[in-house]
Curated annotation (Swiss-Prot):
PROSITE patterns xrefs: AA_TRNA_LIGASE_II (PS50862), TGS (PS51880)
Listed CDD domains: TGS_ThrRS (cd01667), ThrRS_anticodon (cd00860), ThrRS_core (cd00771)
Cited function: Catalyzes the attachment of threonine to tRNA(Thr) in a two-step reaction: L-threonine is first activated by ATP to form Thr-AMP and then transferred to the acceptor end of tRNA(Thr). Also edits incorrectly charged L-seryl-tRNA(Thr).
Binding site for Zn(2+): 344, 395, 521
Family in the record: Belongs to the class-II aminoacyl-tRNA synthetase family.
Organism whose genome encodes this protein: Roseobacter denitrificans (strain ATCC 33942 / OCh 114)
Record EC number: 6.1.1.3
Cofactor(s) it depends on: Zn(2+)
Details of cofactor binding: Binds 1 zinc ion per subunit.
Localization per record: Cytoplasm
Protein name per the record: Threonine--tRNA ligase
């Protein structure tokens, strides 16, 4: 029999018969490893233990201690177990797809009656029964005709449609546990009993169109979460409870920041308090960008399709664009325009005005670019997923030898912004060359080395995301971690030689000839709308004092203090503090509760004693203790707190 060579993570190699399974390989190492093994990564792909290996490859055996692979298997198996449970309870239900998603899975069902929240408990109970049966998981490869005949006979039209969409040369794998069977690529555990029965929970029911097409059947989607142990599930559910308390939509109402309405889906109606946050943040970013050497520009909202065709967006991005047809002076054909979904092609137009020399590079442009992108209504989410948004967009035109310095400077800039906004920790994901790419290997080598050297120069840890770069260049993604451990991808840095070529951007080099510049796309916040949502949730509404829309409320205890309240407010405002008076005929405890719900950072109470002594009683949000301060001292202290960090 033919032999194959398998290379293990420690670099050692061993010979095996071709067709050996990952389970056999684990058993050859030790009996204990075979008992603990759940799957294997072979040649970079994840397989179950029954998968035969026919060629030389790298191999890593996984156990439940390998969290990434274990979570994938547990969640994948639970998707199948849930579908089986549903069909055992309601046999007439038709199954469709059930992928693994972040923290869990979902499965879409076609059922005449709607699932109720009470049904989730029934399904969970049945799932635990299936887990306790410890049914072996087995797999077979079927030909297309047999698979279609099977699903047609069982009245599963969605599976037939899925099979017809699979390329003809791709094998069709069928997985069973018990008598229940599903079409699936795998991998899966060896029996249902390997799934932790106390570490999953069904979460919610939603509607979903088949294939995401509103003209197709409306299905019912059941979501679940799962982990490798009950303590991890408990921690996740606690985090979800905390996230619900921090939901920016809830806090947005309580703080009177914004609202959304059906007449303008995905567009934000900013109220004065919310707009104060927005403009304060924008002013801060404007100063930071200027200090980093960027020139601010502004480009049109409505742009003719010709530019989008030239840039390539018309072909690749049109479904996300808002198209505007204009009857130009009763011309034979209407002019076709689009609301810009991004700013980069317009920035190239500015670069192309006038001759550019190598001495002009790097040339840095920044724009608070207002963009519009179509998102399905079901994907919209408060101010975090919208159709109209503003980016802190920037583009640098430079030579190849300038990329490293520009990248390092941006990482330093981004780090200082995140720190000022209360995010001490972020992760850099370095996406490298994909399999399908343009450009020479030498150019890719140089550019990837430039980005890696830049990251190392700044001292930030990073993770390689191999093969996930764009077809024309590598990129960096920056992920923030918030106060409850959630990750948010906000910042980006993308190397792009493609768009300057498509839009014919050139500069005159030292040799007197024309050369193409590299275009570096970068954003720090991403969009103001989404980032403000993240800020609200990260801080639970207790924004940094300098960003808070209502920084201080001065509240009267007695009506005789009203004039002094106004005097205090005037003095604070003169010191740059956003201060308001509350002289309503209400009890002070009522005023404190109301303004605390509105997340006002500081409340100054003023009564007869404060009027006489020219003092205030200071209470900070979330604290029970108060302190009596002189008006001059509190004005000076709060004036400093109200100053943006870049101006201190």
């Amino acid at each position: 029999m033919a032999q194959i060579s398998l290379t293990f993570p420690d670099g050692s190699t061993r010979e095996f018969d071709a067709g050996v399974t990952a389970g056999d390989v684990a058993a050859s190492i030790s009996t204990s490893l075979r008992k603990k093994a759940i799957s294997a990564t072979v040649g970079g792909a994840h397989y179950d233990l029954a998968w035969p290996i026919h060629a030389d490859a790298t191999i890593a055996i996984h156990t439940m201690q390998d969290e990434e692979q274990a979570n994938e298997l547990v969640r994948h198996d639970l998707a199948h177990i849930m579908a089986r449970a549903v069909q055992e309870i309601w046999p007439e239900t038709k199954v469709t797809i059930g992928p693994v998603i972040k923290d869990g899975w979902y499965y879409d069902f076609d059922r005449a009656e709607a699932f109720s929240p009470e049904d989730l408990g029934l399904i969970e109970k049945k799932m635990k029964e299936i887990i306790n049966k410890r049914d072996p998981v087995r797999t077979e490869v079927w030909d297309r005709a047999r698979a279609i005949a099977h699903y047609e006979a069982n009245d599963e039209p969605y599976k037939v449609e899925l099979i017809n969409a699979i390329p003809g040369d791709e094998p069709l794998r069928m997985y069973w546990h018990g008598d229940w069977q599903d079409l699936c690529r795998g991998p899966h555990l060896q029996h249902t009993g390997q799934v932790p029965g106390d570490a999953f929970k069904l979460m919610s029911i939603a509607g979903a169109y088949w294939r995401g097409d509103s003209d197709r059947a409306m299905l019912q989607r059941i979501y679940g979460v799962a982990f490798t142990g009950k303590e991890k599930l408990k921690a996740h559910l606690t985090m979800l409870e905390e996230a619900a308390k921090r939901d920016h939509r809830k806090l947005g109402r309580e703080m009177d920041l914004f609202h959304m309405q059906e007449e303008a889906p995905g567009q934000v109606f900013w109220h004065p308090n919310g707009w104060s946050i927005y403009t304060t943040l924008q002013d801060y970013m404007r100063r930071k960008q200027r200090a980093a050497g960027y020139q601010e520009v502004n480009t049109p909202q409505v742009v003719d399709r010709k530019l989008w065709e030239a840039s390539g967006h018309w072909d690749k991005y049109q479904e996300h664009m808002f198209i505007v047809e204009v009857d130009e002076d009763h011309a034979r054909e209407k002019a076709v325009n689009a609301l810009k979904p991004m700013n980069c092609p317009c920035h190239v137009q500015i670069f192309n005005q006038g001759l550019k020399s190598y001495r002009d590079l790097p040339l840095r442009m920044a724009e608070f670019g207002s963009c519009n992108r179509y998102e399905p209504s079901g994907a919209l989410h408060g101010i975090m997923r919208v159709r109209g948004f503003t980016q802190d967009d920037g583009h640098t035109f430079c030579r190849e030898d300038q990329i490293e310095a520009e990248c390092a400077a941006f990482i330093t800039y981004l780090s200082s912004v995140y720190q000022d906004l209360g995010f001490e920790k972020f992760e850099i994901m370095f996406a490298t060359r994909p399999e399908k790419r343009v450009g020479s290997e030498e150019s890719w080598d140089h550019v990837e080395a430039a980005l890696e050297n830049a990251i190392k120069a700044t001292g930030h840890p990073y993770t390689l995301d191999e093969g996930e770069g764009a077809f024309y260049g590598p990129k960096l993604d920056f992920k923030l971690t918030d106060a409850i451990g959630r990750e948010w991808q906000c910042g980006t840095f993308q190397v792009d030689p493609n768009l300057p070529e498509r839009l014919d951007a050139t500069y005159i080099g030292q040799d007197g000839a024309k050369h193409r510049p590299y275009m570096l796309h970068r954003a720090c916040l991403g969009s103001f709308e989404r980032f403000i949502g993240i800020l609200i949730e990260n801080s639970a509404g207790k924004l940094p004092f300098w960003l808070a829309p209502r920084q201080v409320v001065v509240a009267s205890i007695i009506s005789d203090a009203d004039d002094y309240v106004l005097e205090v407010v005037e003095k604070l405002q003169a010191a740059g503090v956003r201060a308001e008076a509350d002289v309503r005929n209400e009890k002070i405890n009522y005023k404190v509760r109301e303004h605390s719900v509105g997340k006002v950072p500081v409340i100054l109470a003023v009564g007869a004693r404060e009027v006489e002594e020219k003092t205030v009683t200071l209470r900070r949000l979330g604290e029970k203790k108060t302190s009596v301060e002189t008006l001059d001292a509190v004005t000076q202290a709060l004036g400093r707190e109200a100053t943006p960090p870049d101006l201190l």
